[in-house]
């Protein structure tokens, strides 16, 4: 059975409202959620805060509907970048950013989108859905992002609220799918209220409207989310998985086949 995730529940100052979001997600069958703290350096006095502690939200975690285990609550940081200087905090992951399980970047220009895909130390690249896409997607940076293990995130709650945003969301999604062909796409709610969250199978059906195949749409709320979380774990520890192969020593018969220089070293 698939493990479903919603990696964008909007963090606010109201902890009671945040609890309601998490409880609703668990009731709908999500096993993993991420509480999203958003920073826009274009606004004054913006800084990266410490993530919300799970212990502040719940003494006992809600049980996932249809499962016998509690929901897993992770933390996420999203940086909105509208100027190249905003990227500095994400080039070599800052100590504050490393406190978060997931780090996302929301680039506002084509140049910043290219930088995000090719250089920034993040897990997710957010796609604009609340306004007309300010640039066209190009294949080279998207292919680099896929090779680096980054995921592209589309959010659906704006499409629920407003018909104009619904058009923007579908248009942005279809433009993205033309290039990435459904690879490394995740779909999140960006919910601020419980009524804005939809069940994982409803979200997968929504993915069909976004141009995803049936299997890619399901992956967008399950396996692709898991891959993004594993990418975040690697980023936080700054170590990948290293595979070592022990080189066998040459046998006496093999030494006759060695070049003269290497044979001399072996004899020495």
UniProtKB/Swiss-Prot annotation:
Ranges where the record places region Disordered: 247-268
| Subcellular location field | Nucleus, Nucleolus
Q: Which UniProt keywords apply?
A: Acetylation, Nucleus, Phosphoprotein, RNA-binding, rRNA processing, tRNA processing
Example of a GO biological process term: rRNA processing
N-acetylalanine carried by residues: 2
- Residues bearing Phosphoserine are 251
The superkingdom of the source organism is Eukaryota
GO molecular-function terms, A-Z:
ribonuclease P activity; ribonuclease P RNA binding; RNA binding
Where is it found, in Gene Ontology cellular component terms? Answer: multimeric ribonuclease P complex; nucleolar ribonuclease P complex; nucleoplasm; nucleus; ribonuclease MRP complex
Other remarks?
Autoantibodies against RPP30 are found in sera from scleroderma patients.
User: What family, per the record?
Assistant: Belongs to the eukaryotic/archaeal RNase P protein component 3 family.
Q: What subunit structure does UniProt give? A: Component of nuclear RNase P and RNase MRP ribonucleoproteins. RNase P consists of a catalytic RNA moiety and about 10 protein subunits; POP1, POP4, POP5, POP7, RPP14, RPP21, RPP25, RPP30, RPP38 and RPP40. Within the RNase P complex, POP1, POP7 and RPP25 form the 'finger' subcomplex, POP5, RPP14, RPP40 and homodimeric RPP30 form the 'palm' subcomplex, and RPP21, POP4 and RPP38 form the 'wrist' subcomplex. All subunits of the RNase P complex interact with the catalytic RNA. Several subunits of RNase P are also part of the RNase MRP complex.
Q: What does this protein do?
A: Component of ribonuclease P, a ribonucleoprotein complex that generates mature tRNA molecules by cleaving their 5'-ends. Also a component of the MRP ribonuclease complex, which cleaves pre-rRNA sequences.
Q: What is this protein called?
A: Ribonuclease P protein subunit p30
Provide the species name: Homo sapiens
């Amino acid at each position: 059975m698939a493990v479903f995730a919603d990696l964008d529940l909007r963090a606010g100052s109201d902890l009671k409202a945040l609890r309601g979001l998490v409880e609703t997600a668990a009731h709908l069958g999500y096993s993993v959620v991420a509480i999203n703290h958003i920073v826009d350096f274009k606004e004054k006095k913006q800084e990266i805060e410490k993530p919300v502690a799970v212990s502040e939200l719940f003494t006992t975690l809600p049980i996932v509907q249809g499962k016998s285990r509690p929901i897993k609550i992770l933390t996420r940081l999203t940086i909105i970048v509208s100027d190249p200087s905003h990227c500095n905090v994400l080039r070599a992951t800052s100590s504050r950013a490393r406190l978060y399980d997931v780090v996302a970047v929301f680039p506002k220009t084509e140049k910043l989108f290219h930088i995000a895909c090719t250089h920034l130390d993040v897990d997710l690249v957010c796609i604009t859905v609340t306004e007309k896409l300010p640039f066209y997607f190009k294949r080279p940076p998207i292919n680099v992002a896929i090779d680096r293990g980054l995921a592209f995130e589309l959010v659906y709650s704006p499409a629920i609220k407003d018909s104009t945003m619904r058009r923007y969301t579908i248009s942005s999604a279809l433009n993205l799918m033309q290039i990435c062909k459904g690879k490394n796409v995740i779909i999140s709610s960006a919910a601020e209220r419980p009524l804005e969250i939809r069940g994982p199978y409803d979200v997968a059906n929504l993915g069909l409207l976004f141009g995803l195949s049936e299997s890619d749409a399901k992956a967008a709320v399950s396996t692709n989310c898991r891959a993004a979380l594993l990418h975040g774990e690697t980023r936080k520890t700054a170590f990948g998985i290293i595979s070592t192969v022990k080189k066998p020593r040459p046998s006496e018969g093999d030494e006759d086949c060695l070049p003269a220089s290497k044979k001399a070293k072996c004899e020495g």
